[in-house]
């Protein structure tokens, strides 16, 4: 086996272990934020939405800067620094009793993510061969789902005792992850050339096809981020207990572990990437529309199940498209900018979703936020269809297995 092949194989295992630690650390804390501050402390949902939206926008919106810096200086220092910064954010969150302190903790958490997320994504593109990326992204997403359930279960159990224990556990996991990277991650370059920060950013911004694709996905992310805000609140409201939230993540894990990889393997040779992305988005949009009208957990979990199936269909295609469009001369910059749609959509989804949720309660129209999200999903579906027309998008990007 050549040294390059050996490095790729070892790199796969490193990426999987690293991803599991990051997912566990994140999901121990973040799914419980809305329950802690809205249901337990009585804050308005929009206040928590601002905090979550701020974290999302800082992490993803500034990702191009984190990626460009990683292109210049390498992945390792950015990843280690970012993970320690997120640990500090979680520690601060544990003592947050005023909105400004929660916002500051989410700012720290997001800034840490800005530093470590783009280089981690670029390492996947660097270490995984193009023909294997779709399946590897599916494995990562299966791992994300399992880690989400384990993290949410652990966080829900700790929340019975003290929210500070929840935050301390998340912080410890990110400190462990920082040590793991500091010890084992080689000083790899992300790009084929050591690209200056400004040059990497310029290269991305001049790629109109990539920019359009990323910005169009903002509507997709407005729906996707509700698993952290409105869906946990809805489950808690109907069940009357935050313990029921763990079953929401259990549903996601079961569906992902049983369906994600088989669907990706089966569909990659039969359907074009844009068809898979759009089909998943359509299912997600349809499942959102009736959520505000359900009256029991069985109905709600059925719709959540449909939402997750849509995500299982869409996510591998979305990640593969983003990776396939990245210029090898500026991988970090491209993968950082690819998060901008999540920054915009996530911020609007959290803040706007929280505001609509409060408004729906005030007007006695609980279906209002869910109807709006469904409509946004349909608009995004049409926008993607327009973008993916043959007149606008090169065929190579869309072929099965691309």
From Swiss-Prot:
Residues 34-98, 160-164, 235-243, 298-299, 361-367 are periplasmic. It is found in: Cell inner membrane. Its main location: membrane. It is a multi-pass membrane protein. Disulfide bonds: none annotated. Pfam families: MFS_1. Keywords: Cell inner membrane, Cell membrane, Membrane, Transmembrane, Transmembrane helix, Transport. The keyword Cell membrane applies. Residues 1-12, 117-138, 186-213, 265-276, 321-339, 389-402 are cytoplasmic. The chain crosses the membrane at residues 13-33, 99-116, 139-159, 165-185, 214-234, 244-264, 277-297, 300-320, 340-360, 368-388. It comes from the Bacteria. The keyword Transmembrane helix applies. One of its GO terms (cellular component) is plasma membrane. GO terms for molecular function: transmembrane transporter activity. HAMAP family: MFS_MdtH. This is Multidrug resistance protein MdtH. It comes from Salmonella newport (strain SL254).
């Amino acid at each position: 086996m050549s040294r390059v092949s050996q490095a790729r194989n070892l790199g796969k295992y490193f990426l999987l272990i690293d991803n599991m630690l990051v997912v566990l650390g994140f999901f121990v804390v973040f799914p419980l934020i809305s329950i802690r501050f809205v249901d337990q402390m009585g804050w308005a949902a929009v206040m928590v939405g601002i905090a979550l939206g701020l974290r999302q926008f800082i992490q993803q919106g500034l990702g191009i800067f984190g990626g460009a810096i990683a292109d210049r200086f390498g992945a390792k220092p950015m990843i280690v620094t970012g993970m320690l910064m997120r640990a500090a954010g979680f520690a601060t969150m544990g003592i947050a009793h005023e909105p400004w302190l929660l916002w500051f903790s989410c700012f720290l958490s997001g800034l840490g993510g800005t530093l470590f997320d783009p280089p981690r994504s670029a390492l996947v593109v660097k270490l995984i061969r193009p023909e294997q990326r779709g399946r590897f992204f599916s494995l990562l997403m299966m791992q994300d789902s399992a880690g989400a359930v384990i993290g949410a279960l652990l966080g829900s159990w700790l929340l019975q005792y003290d929210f500070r224990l929840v935050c301390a556990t998340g912080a410890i996991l990110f400190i462990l992850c920082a040590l793991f990277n500091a010890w084992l991650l080689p000083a790899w370059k992300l790009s084929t050339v050591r690209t200056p920060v400004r040059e990497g950013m310029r290269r991305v911004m001049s790629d109109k096809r990539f920019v359009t694709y990323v910005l169009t996905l903002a509507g997709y992310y407005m729906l996707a981020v509700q698993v952290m805000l409105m869906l946990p609140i809805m489950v808690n409201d109907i069940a009357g207990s935050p313990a029921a939230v763990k079953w929401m993540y259990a549903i996601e894990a079961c569906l992902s572990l049983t369906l994600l990889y088989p669907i990706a393997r089966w569909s990659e040779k039969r359907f074009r990437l844009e068809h898979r992305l759009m089909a998943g988005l359509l299912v997600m949009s349809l499942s959102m529309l009736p959520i505000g009208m359900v009256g029991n957990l069985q109905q709600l979990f059925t719709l959540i199940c449909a939402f997750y199936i849509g995500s299982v269909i869409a996510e591998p295609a979305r990640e593969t498209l983003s990776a396939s469009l990245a210029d090898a001369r500026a991988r970090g910059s491209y993968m950082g900018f690819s998060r901008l749609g999540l920054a915009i959509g996530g911020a609007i989804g959290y803040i706007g979703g929280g505001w609509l949720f409060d408004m729906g309660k005030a007007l006695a129209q609980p279906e209002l936020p869910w109807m709006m999200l469904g409509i946004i999903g349909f608009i995004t579906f049409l926008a993607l269809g327009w973008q993916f027309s043959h007149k606008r998008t090169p065929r190579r990007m869309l072929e099965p297995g691309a």
